[in-house]
Amino acid sequence: MTALVTFGETMLRLSPPRGERLETARELEVQAGGAESNVAVAAARLGRDAAWFSKLPDSPLGRRIVSELRSHSVDTDGVVWTDDADARQGVYYLEHGASPRPTNVVYDRADAAVTTLETGEFDLDAVRDAEVCFTSGITPALSETLSETTADVLDEAQNAGTTTAFDLNYRTKLWSPDEAAEVYRDLLDSVDLLFAAERDAATVLGRDGDAESVARGLADDYDIETVVVTRGEEGSLAVSDGAVSEQGVYETETYDAIGTGDAFVGGFLAKHLDGGSVTESLEWASATASFKRTVEGDIAVVTPEDVERVVAEEGDGISR
């Protein structure tokens, strides 16, 4: 049995050297990055068995994705390969900013192979047999086919007794708040553990008020066992079976903020799968996220010792 299975798109990230613009760059650094695979990598590096599945073109670009994930001990045996010449590998370009010039992201993900992935193409037993199955709101946004597949995966997992985890992860460049809300509300009925940025809950689901009221409202309305609300510099809050846990942020010198939220989820799930309480899982989530911000790339190159050191030096979890 695999502890964690994640499902979604992973893209290739192409970045010019810091201080250079995309339009003048002569070199681009290549890395892999995607919400669900970032979560799998973080959990795997923190000692949990983790797998990621998706659909990739059988090309050097698709194989580049798998090679990088495997280097971090993520199981990719469930990946569906296609030799369809029209199936592309999604790419995004990241130009690092420096005040007053903002960081700029340009996506080139249309017609990615994953957008055609149907439920019958992969082995659902991997989902049914996992302890936790995770995906995010990015996945159903990519295509109607993938939206249906996401619903099937969450339903099958929950019906089999697998804990289903979902991060709203709303992206304005993919769909409107109304489009996202319609899909999210259907999916949330099959979610046991929800991660939601405070701004996403407000923008997409119309949930205003303080973090605790937002978390309790979502938990009650959708019968979700645990709801974790992230609040940026104000930390995070979780409501689980009626009990509230809070966690502050850890001070960090930010080098690359991309992937911070995924590292948070990966850290939480790693501790959760190790039998940790919600308060302990929030500590690990916050510590993993802070450590990620010191590392280049989407992926949290972190160890359990790294997280334990951050928690030991600055732990400030609260449970009430």
Swiss-Prot record:
Role description: Involved in the degradation of glucose via the semi-phosphorylative Entner-Doudoroff pathway. Catalyzes the phosphorylation of 2-keto-3-deoxygluconate (KDG) to produce 2-keto-3-deoxy-6-phosphogluconate (KDPG). Also catalyzes efficiently the phosphorylation of 2-keto-3-deoxygalactonate (KDGal) to 2-keto-3-deoxy-6-phosphogalactonate (KDPGal).
Gene induction: Constitutively expressed.
Enzyme class: transferase
Protein name in UniProt: 2-dehydro-3-deoxygluconokinase/2-dehydro-3-deoxygalactonokinase
Residues of the active site: D262 (proton acceptor)
Deletion phenotype: Deletion of the gene abolishes growth on glucose, but does not affect growth on galactose. Double deletion mutant kdgK1/kdgK2 loses the ability to grow on galactose.
Record carries keyword Nucleotide-binding: yes
Pathway membership, UniProt: Carbohydrate acid metabolism; 2-dehydro-3-deoxy-D-gluconate degradation; D-glyceraldehyde 3-phosphate and pyruvate from 2-dehydro-3-deoxy-D-gluconate: step 1/2
Record-annotated disulphide pairs: none
Annotated residues for binding of substrate: G34, A35, E36, S37, N38, Y92, Y107, D108, R109, R171, D262, D298
Gene Ontology molecular function: any one: ATP binding
Family: Belongs to the carbohydrate kinase PfkB family.
Quaternary state and interactors: Homohexamer.
